[in-house]
Amino acid sequence: MPQKVRIALDAMGGDFGPSVVIPGAAIALGRHPDAEFLLFGDSALIDKELAAHPALKKVSRVVHTDVAVSMHDKPSQALRRGRKVSSMWLAIEAVKKGEADVAVSAGNTGALMAMARFCLRTLPGIDRPAIAATWPTVRGDSVVLDLGATIGGDAAHLKALAVMGAAMASVLFDLERPTVGLLNIGVEEIKGGEEIREAAELLRAMQSPPFEFIGFVEGDGIGSGAADVIVSEGFSGNIALKAAEGTARQIIQLLRDAMSRTWSAKIGYLFARGAFRALRDKIDPNKSNGGVFLGLNGIVVKSHGGTNADGFAYAVDVSYDMVRYDLLTKINQTLNRETGALVSTPSAQEAVS
């Protein structure tokens, strides 16, 4: 019998806390019956939600704490107030102690990053982790990073992101040499700032890298699937992410409005319903929920704070897959082969939201 996947959940994280986290975990359990859960937070609120999900209750253990990190806490505040005692910290610490294989939180991104870095520590040479996620494209899926873990960063930081992102793509997509592109304002070699041009030179100079560097990729190349891995510093990456999510929701709403405007449109929708549903499912931001913190001595997955139960379930799916794919070990192996990419990035600033 395969070993259970042990998932630690910050039950108080996000805009809605247990009312989304617990139903979301129940949905994910239906897809992954070999999972079990550690639930950290207010036991009264958690037990109230668990009462409606007996199957989840059977494979869960609740650990009570009165302290929760709010969505408005600064990372420094969260560490001072929540270290050792908050639901977010305890979920991460469960990974450090070997009680869980992965931690998932929908809480404050800056606080989660600070706590994860402080508790788990980063891999040798990595100054700060990155947030990586799969991104739906016309060619399938790509890995995009950094989606907001750090603001800024030098060329060596971007090189390290490329190495980690390529390792993740190799594991998830079963690719021997995934293609890697640097997000830029143009594809010409003279475009972009000094850091990104220098990063391109560093990547081209790598000896037999486990990926193919294709150069610069513009913003429209993310959705077109121009590369298996798109690398950006966290400021630009987060803007791209939020813009894409907003566009996806706008398209879904515009289609819904157009299909309900007239009787002929409604009749047409009946004939094309399957195609419209497929499009909606492809671009639904909930189905791309779950960013993986790369560069840590442990696996932490970040869910959107405002997601619903279905969206949180997809974040749990991501955490499950990271464990089943043994992603951490495989990324570490790749990084160890490319020790030249593992350098500190003193210019990078910690994101706070």
From Swiss-Prot:
Keywords: Cytoplasm, Lipid biosynthesis, Lipid metabolism, Phospholipid biosynthesis, Phospholipid metabolism, Transferase. GO terms for biological process: fatty acid biosynthetic process; phospholipid biosynthetic process. It is an enzyme of class 2 (transferase). Its EC number is 2.3.1.274. It is found in: Cytoplasm. InterPro entries: FA_synthesis, Phospholipid_synth_PlsX-like. It catalyses: a fatty acyl-[ACP] + phosphate = an acyl phosphate + holo-[ACP]. Its main location: cytoplasm. Pathway: Lipid metabolism; phospholipid metabolism. GO terms for molecular function: phosphate:acyl-[acyl carrier protein] acyltransferase activity. GO terms for cellular component: cytoplasm. Catalyzes the reversible formation of acyl-phosphate (acyl-PO(4)) from acyl-[acyl-carrier-protein] (acyl-ACP). This enzyme utilizes acyl-ACP as fatty acyl donor, but not acyl-CoA. Belongs to the PlsX family. Homodimer. Probably interacts with PlsY. This is Phosphate acyltransferase. It comes from Rhodopseudomonas palustris (strain BisB5). The lineage of its organism: Bacteria, Pseudomonadati, Pseudomonadota, Alphaproteobacteria, Hyphomicrobiales.
